[in-house]
Amino acid sequence: MAKRIIYNENARRALEKGMDILAESVAVTLGPKGRNVVLEKKFGAPQIVNDGVTIAKEIELEDHIENTGVALIRQAASKTNDAAGDGTTTATVLAHAMVKEGLRNVAAGANPIALKRGIDKATQFLVEKIAEHARPVEDSKAIAQVAAISAGNDEEVGRMIADAMDKVGKEGVISLEEGKSMTTELEVTEGMRFDKGYISPYFATDTERMEAVLDEPFVLVTDKKITLVQDLVPILEQVARAGKPLVIIAEDIEKEALATLVVNRLRGVLNVAAVKAPGFGDRRKAMLEDIAVLTAGQVITEDAGLKLENAKLDMLGKARRITITKDHTTIVAEGNEKAVKARCEQIRRQIEETDSSYDKEKLQERLAKLAGGVAVIKVGAATETEMKDRKLRLEDAINATKAAVEEGIVPGGGTTLVHLAPELSNWAAEHLTGEELIGANIVERALSAPLRRIAENAGQNGAIIVERVKEKPFDVGYDAAKDEYVNMFDAGIVDPAKVTRSALQNAASIAGMVLTTECIIVDKPEPKENNPAGSGAGMGGDFDY
């Protein structure tokens, strides 16, 4: 495939053009009075969104070079989304402002490498300052404020997420599901819950609700497939003598063994229920070990030299109550805190050591099931389009609250960045010289871009509002929803420090890369063939096949 090569100013200008298009599409959503963007979908109804990274992912331009610019700035948004889960629009607006300002200086003859060094040093200074100004999140009121702002000023959502965080703790997991009703509901599960139900509906003890509820049961955990009932007979006899119910968690139970269990259950000889083991492969083994730790039992596995036919009562776990439906199993156990704590600590260390975000997420889920609990928010809405929009907003809100708990909160609405601009200016004048100083000044001028855009989206003059905010104390900023200057902490307009920091770092990184670009190589567009009219081969020429 032939390539097109563009050098110097032309290359940078083409990138800038693509960035302008993307930044404008994303920036319209910024702030409490930001608008929505409608995305056409190949199948199904159009999607209405207010989420920066979702919009950025949709934009593809015809011109390959401009499209490269789009891809670069999109990276700033998605990297921020990966790191903090929110702040994607801010990252896009910041990156765009830095590139605009920087290109002006490069065109005037400044050295891009020196500018990049200045940008990097300024960013490092600002990151330290953001950490200094961050306040730790102590109460659920602050969590509710962060969540409400992130969900588009929805206080009800804020309260719901704060409530969920309260119930499941910092280690807990809050997941989203599409609800069946118009209202958004919160459901918190006590104990460990996994997505496997009973193997046979005959195990249900409550036929009306089709669930099996076993109080004070023994728990047999094994990673092997149970094929012969003879393997189970010794342990079943011991459990029957003890007069307690039994829950079997195994890879699978073949028909013959299953039939025997069902017959015993129906005749009332033994109250028993069987569940397939959750997960796959190594993850299944780890989850079975988690269940064994929680219930103070052992995993009966040949890896440890244990066989089912030799199993003793003291190898079985005990639970306070186990509830099994056709889709999931919930184990509520108590009294084994020490072992559970040690297991949680082990999982935490694994989380710190792993680089894969997927593994991190799965380990976090395991930790939540052991330590805190799991909250499910069922998102309700009148139409599917609204449901998707709400789900995206809620996702942002959950991520923002987690980020706030990690690194604390700072004044929101672009205020922190505007107040840090004079501090950066003074520091740069003292510590930097020449073109590095110009690089720091590029960052300093870009810091006001998010607030300026928030004000413009609210129909105000952005430049005037930025100047007025600069004159006020650090915690005071502009509330675009009410059009007044307020203490941002008192008004509940706060951002997680992690979100502000990630947006700034990723914007500076992309800006530095664009400014130091001297040449672009892209595919040459293929010439379009002009088919003579009506030359559709055999079938009607109007259709795409």
UniProtKB/Swiss-Prot annotation:
Instruction: Tell me the Pfam families matching this sequence.
Output: Cpn60_TCP1
- GO cellular component terms listed in the entry, alphabetical order: cytoplasm
Which compartments does it reside in?
Cytoplasm
Instruction: Give yes or no: UniProt keyword Chaperone.
Output: yes
Keyword presence, Chaperone: yes
The main location class comes to: cytoplasm
Q: Which residues cross the membrane?
A: none
Subunit details: Forms a cylinder of 14 subunits composed of two heptameric rings stacked back-to-back. Interacts with the co-chaperonin GroES.
Name this polypeptide is given? Chaperonin GroEL 1
Q: What is the lineage of its organism?
A: Bacteria, Bacillati, Cyanobacteriota, Cyanophyceae, Acaryochloridales
Name of the gene this protein is made from: groEL1
